[in-house]
C-alpha cells in the first residue's frame, strides 16, 4: 500500500492472528525510502516519529477508507498534529478519524502493552479494537505512559456503546471509563475544551501554527512577551515568542526540569541556561547576561497567568506542572523541607488496583478497597481507609490529586478519618490544594485529627491551624485559635538551625513580609510563661494578607501582644491592633492592589513615613509630598530582595554558604537558655564583630521572639551593655544611639552605636532581656564585639566569600585573553577608607567617597576625623584586593582609580567602573563599590586561570587570610 502524500506518513499492518512481529515503515521525506522498525526489538520511544510526536497524547490516525476497518487487516493512516492551527482540511480522507484512546501497561512477564484504535465517529464501528503489541519495558516516566490523553469531542464511550459492552469488547488490560473521565477533567482544568487534543508542545508548535498558538494565549501571557520585546528591541513580541518556543522545543526533559528548578529558585542551573541562551538566541538582541533572569521572569509570569501554555510547554508529569506553579506563585506556602507538600500527578497510573473506586451515574461501584463504604452521586473517588458520605456532585477524593471544576473544586487527603460532608468546600485533610474559580485555599496541617469522628455540616468549616486564602479580590491570613474537639495531641516539628534560616530569615534576607505563625493549643485559656517556654517553635512564613468578610474565623477579638519598651529608653515600640485599625489596614491593602507587588510586600513598620513638619504644612503644598526620597525602605544592613537574587541566581552563592556564621565569636543561630529568644548571625544578616566608638553599626542585630503570638500579656524587651565579666557598668561604655524596630510580629531589628568611656575596655556584649508581667522570663547575649577606632586597629577582612561572573563569555580584550570579570565578596565587615583629597578626581570629594550606602565607618576616631575639611587629611587606608595568578602575574585592584598602577589602568575602563549590580550612589572613579557594609563588588579585565586572592587595607600590616586556588 502506498504512502499518502504527506511529509510525515506511516503504515501500520494489523494482523489479528499473527501479532508477534509487526513492521512499521516510517517516511519523513518523499525523496528517502521508508525505514522499517520492528516493535519486538525497538522501544517505542526510540522510533523517529515518536521523537517528534507524542503518540500517547497528540497523534490521531486517519484511515484511507472506512472499509479498511472492517474488511481488511491492513489500513493506511497518517498522523495529525493535534492542536489549534495544526489540523488541515485539504485531504478528503479526514472524514473518518480514528483516535488513539488509551494506553495500559501489563504487569506480566512479557511486559507487552496494547494500543487500541477505536473510531470516534458514531457511523463507524468495529467488533474489537485493533491492537499493537510491543515488547516494551514499563517505565512510569516514559511519555507514552505519563502523558494524559485529551479529547475535544464527546467521549466515544457515550456515543458507541454502553459500559457493559465496552467491558466485553475491550482487551482485558484496557480500561476506558477511568481514563476517559480523567481526560475530561484535565481538559477542563487546563481550559483546553476548544483545542483538539492538547498534545505535546513538540507536536503543537511549528512555524506554520506559531501565529495561531500565540493568538490563543491569554492577554496576560501576551503582555509578558510584549515586555520582553521592549527589552530586546527591535524584536517583536511574536519573534520573541518564536525564539523562546523554539528554544524550549529543542530541550530535553532533563533540561526542562532544570529550567523548572531555576524558576523555583533551586540552585545549579546557571550553566545550562547560559549555554542555551548563548547558542540559541541572538546575543545582540537578547543579552546573555540578562537571559537567565528574563527566562525566569517569563516563566513565572506565564505560569501565573496562563495554565494552558504551561501545559503545552511542559508536557511532563502533571505534578511537575503543579510543583512549578506552586513554587513560582507569589502566594505559595513556605514550609520546612521535612513537611513540604507532596502532590502526585493528576493522572498518575495507579499500579495498585486494590485502591481504585469507579462510581458511575447508577451508583455502580467496582471497588477492590479495604474498609471503604461510599455513597456517591456522579462521583469518581479514590479513598484509602475512609468512610465518606458525599451528597454533592463533582467531588473527587483521592491521595495527592488535583481537581479543578468551575463550581466545586475539592481536594481531600483523608487518613483514617470518618467524615460526614454535607456541603461544599468542607476540607479535613493533611495536605490539600483547593482551586476554585473564586477562591484558592492552601491548607497545611501536621498530624492533626487522626482517628477522629468529625461532623461538618456547614459551608467553609475547616479544622486546621494554618489557612491561607486567596480570593480574586481579597487576601486573608488566618490563625485558628481553636483546638480539636477531643484535645488530641499536636506534634510540632522541631526545626534545626539550618532550617531556621530558610524558614525565618527569607523574609529578612529576601525581604518578604514575615509572620511567625503560632501553634495555638489553648482552649481560649491563658497560658502561663512556663507553658509557653515548653512549646516548640514552628515558624511558617506567609505573606500577611487582608482579612475578608467571608472568613469563617473571626479574628476581631484576638488580641495581638504588645511590645513595650521601658520609659528610660529612647525608642518605644507598642503594637496594638483594634477593630478600627483592622478596617484601616483593609482599606490600605485594597488600595495597594493596583500598586507594584514589591510595594505591597514591604512591611508597614519599615516603610518611610512623612515628617510631622510636612503633615502640618499650611503653605498650600500637598500633605505627604516631599522631594526627598528615602534610599531604601528596608532596614540598613539587610539586603534587598533584588540583591539577594543577584547573589544567589547570578553569582551562584549557595544557601549553605550564606548561612555560615558571620561573627566568628558566635554561632550562626544563637539561642537563649529557655528557648524564647534567638539571634541571627549569618552572612545575610550579620552581627558586627568590630565597631568604632560613636559610629553606627550598620549591621545591627536581628532578634526573634519565638511563639510570639501565644503571649496574651504585655511583653517588654530590654537591652543593655555588659562586660566580659557579665556585668553592667555604665562607667565603661554606654549606648549613644539605640533604636528597636518591629519588622513583623516576633521579628525585631536593633540599631545602635556605643560610646566607650573607659579606653581600657576592648570588648563588649549586648544583652536582651524578655520581660513578661514584670519578670525576666528569658535573656540572650550577642557574640563578642570589639572596639576598633582606626583602620589600623581593625582586622583585615577574614572569612571572605567570593564569587565571580564573566560578563561576556565570548569576548577577550588582550593578548593574554583577559575577560571582563565581575566580583562580589561577602565578609563580616568591609571598611571603606578615605581617599586623600589630592589623589581624588576633581568631581568627587572626600565626603562623597565615604558616604556610600552601607558604609560602616571611615578612618579616624569617631566623627572628629571625617567631618571637617579644614583639618589636615591623614593618610587614608582604603580597601584593596590583590590577585596573584599561578603564572606569576599579579594585579592589585584598588578602591579608587587614582590608586591603580599606570600599567594596569587599562584593566579598569570607565564602562567597567560604572557597572554595578544595583544602582547605588557612588563617586566617579571608584573601582570597589560598597552596596552594604558586608558586601563589596568590583570589575576588572583579568586573564583566566588559578588565583590567590587577598583582601586588605592599604598601609595596614596586619595578617590577611588569602583565598587560595580560586579559578576564574
UniProtKB/Swiss-Prot annotation:
Region spans: Disordered: 124-177, 348-437, 572-595, 608-627, 837-877
Question: Which residue positions does the secretion signal occupy?
Answer: none
Biased region (Polar residues) positions are: 131-157
Query: What InterPro entries does the record point to?
Result: PKHG5/7
One Gene Ontology term from the biological process aspect of the record:
Rho protein signal transduction
Indicate, by first and last residue, each region the UniProt record lists as having compositional bias (Low complexity). Answer: 158-177, 352-431, 572-593, 841-857
Under which name does UniProt file this protein? Answer: Uncharacterized protein DDB_G0289917
